[in-house]
């Protein structure tokens, strides 16, 4: 017997994940190209939000922008996208995976660079690929 549990992930939790992962937890595998930054800044100018780590989520959630995420070792290679179209299904996949502890830590406000990295990988790639 299986019981399906759905959890609401507040925007504030998603913001914290983006801040922690983009400012350190995930920088060993991802790269934001100048094109990605341009896409983000066209949706959310610096005058609205000067921090890229929070502007990226605003661009995705508020302006339905799809942000390409590149490989840090091959800056030309797009390895995934941060998109409102895939965000829910990918976070649900995380909630149903062996890595769900990372999401639970974030929801309990006990997240760190490791848990944020795992959640961010699911948000962008749909699975843990790095680390």
Question: Which functions belong to the PLM regions below?
Answer:
Residues 1, 70-76, 126-127:
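Short, flexible beta-strand-to-coil junctions
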Residues 1-69:
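Long, contiguous N-terminal structural blocks used for assembly/anchoring
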Residues 91-101:
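Short acidic, glycine/tyrosine-flanked loop/strand segments centered on an H-E-D-like triad
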Residues 104-130:
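Acidic, proline/glycine-rich low-complexity IDRs
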